[in-house]
Amino acid sequence: MAEQDAPEKRGRLSRPLVLGAAVALVDREGLGALTMRRLAAELGVESMALYRYTPGKEALIDGLVEAYFDEINARLRAGSTGGSHPDGWRAELRRIARAFAATAHAHPEILPLVATRPLAVPVARRPASVLDLTEHILAVLGRAGFDDAGSLTVYRTFVAWNLGCLLVDKRQVVDNPSEPDPALRLGLHRLPAADYPRLRALVPRFADFDHEAEMLSGLDSLLDGMPEPPLDDFYRDGGS
């Protein structure tokens, strides 16, 4: 029966299906579990069947980034009002930041790749899903009235802040992930209170820390330091 099923499954293969299975495998077992052979087994096909959709392991890893940004873009489309955000460019950047955070929460094992893999190739060779989000952000800023230099400054600041916050949040190593006591989970009980009184005093704060609220609050502070574009009302009015 398995031999009869395999050709049928091969016929249903597609790049989105292959990348979706790769994302699911990495979510469950980590990046170290991802091999062409293991992914083929997950899909019920021979390894060679995958090479039509991805030429090898490195390309497959890049495909994880592609799928990650596809998900961000899908989240943004699902929550789109169909035009300019009624509250302006800042509100749209906050909406993008939330979509980025939700995707990072869903796929924390892929997040470090998002911070490094796109930078390893020239801009024009990055996945279309990465370029689509970049274009959207730059278009938001352009419609708001930022000139080219201002748009790039805000874009780079926005991306750096989001990635930095999410990497600290999602990739923090803890002593015991299942431990409910934050002092024990983070290993802070090992620190002498006399030497590190402030760290020890902040232990209760770690228990109810809202990372997304901190990220958005910090983003607002960064954007407050940006000069308002001269055509800000243009974006608010939808360009009319």
Predicted regions and their residues:
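N-terminal intrinsically disordered/low-complexity leader segments
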Residues: 1-13, 73, 77-81, 197-205, ...
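Hydrophobic alpha-helical connector segments
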Residues: 74-122, 129-132
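Amphipathic alpha-helical packing segments from all-alpha helical-bundle domains
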Residues: 119-145, 149-156, 168, 188-197
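Amphipathic alpha-helical interaction segments
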Residues: 17, 59, 95, 132, ...
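Amphipathic C-terminal alpha-helical segment
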Residues: 157-175, 189-212, 224-231
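Alpha-helical structural segments
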Residues: 17-24, 28-29, 59-78, 91, ...
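Short, hydrophobic secondary-structure boundary micro-motifs
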Residues: 35, 112-115, 199-200, 235
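Helix-turn-helix
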Residues: 17, 25-59, 63
